[in-house]
């Protein structure tokens, strides 16, 4: 991660597959005070960056549909800019699952720009392969698979809105193993050994944010020791990650249905980290999905 102090001009390259939210992210950056240039032909990139300019932060939208798109050119440009005093180049990658990208194109009835007629999945796969080196090089990766436009705005503002030097940001989430592991997660803890409230009729329809469910889960004799050891592990590792320059860490707790045990554990862990002064956000994947299905 390059220097992003207030004395350095931020230059953010923004890319990602079609349908992942690149245009929305650029709009947020423009609202945050960035000069935004979208779809700049890569053959003009060097000349554009050589032009003297103000200290206003700059966001460059990189569209893989451009005829001269090249991951090598972009990576080389980032490397070149990194060595220039007073500049802070970064790569923001908007990621999204293939399934959700396909659904978004189906819902909008748009044709994927790289796909043969009526075969959008082929275009999505091709585009993701093209973007692979940039995803691996990304300084900030935002997975928009389960984000709405408001949540995406909050994520982009968190990383790039004015406010000085970034701190390590911690994301804590719960999930269901039935639906698979979350994408781009750093640490995963399995809560399925804890007593399951699902088998208690009066608790089945509730979730882990409810006091009765929390009381039931935390009453398990193994809960306190498990929670304490997880807290201790995170509090040991977070300063080390921060000191190494890591700016984002994702911690996930899973159980069978993602409704009870993992939710309680995620809530408790996020609260503990916040009490220690860490910047924490929390989300419950399955609860959010259910809420979206009901609206």
From Swiss-Prot:
Pfam families named among the record's database cross-references: PapZ_C, RapZ-like_N
Gene Ontology molecular function, alphabetical:
ATP binding; GTP binding
Per the record, the domain of life is Bacteria
User: In its UniProt entry, what is this protein called?
Assistant: Nucleotide-binding protein RD1_1380
Instruction: Quote the function comment for this protein.
Output: Displays ATPase and GTPase activities.
The entry's keywords:
ATP-binding, GTP-binding, Nucleotide-binding
Q: What InterPro entries would the database entry show?
A: P-loop_NTPase, RapZ-like, RapZ-like_N, RapZ_C
Membership in a protein family: Belongs to the RapZ-like family.
Disulfide pairings: none
| PANTHER family tied to this protein | RNASE ADAPTER PROTEIN RAPZ (PTHR30448:SF0)
Upper classification of the source organism reads:
Bacteria, Pseudomonadati, Pseudomonadota, Alphaproteobacteria, Rhodobacterales
Question: Quick check: keyword GTP-binding in the entry?
Answer: yes
Q: Which residues bind GTP?
A: 63-66
Q: Where is the signal peptide?
A: none
Q: Where does ATP bind?
A: 16-23
